[in-house]
Amino acid sequence: MLVMAKGLASGLPLSGIAARRELMERWVPGSHGGTYGGNAVACAAAVATIRAIREEGLLENAQRMGARLMESLQALQNEFPVVGDVRGLGLMVVSEFTAPDGSPATDLAKAVVKGCLKRHLMLLTCGPWDNTIR
């Protein structure tokens, strides 16, 4: 099952669910829904968004560039033990910062984000301890 929203209609309020037919047919009509019910403008925006993703090869580009990013971040991980983990899919990649004892290195992650911003690279911390950068 794939649940999608936000970028589906390039910022307009729309969400969708995709799954195998046999799974979708188990739901009683009207038993599922949400606050992003499709209107004509949002649906047209979603069609245009999906068309642009396909025609411009955005998924392939995200895979290619994401692999390069992962490679670079893994090289940094090998050089700097404070990078405890590097993970992701496509261009949604994170680096998790950990202290030598394995605890979350929140202050370090925030300092890295601040240093990157000074170099005009906008990143953000995330995760339950704010020690992960994406």
Model-derived features: where do they sit?
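Conserved N-terminal phosphate-binding loop of PLP-dependent enzymes in the Aspartate aminotransferase
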Residues: 1-134
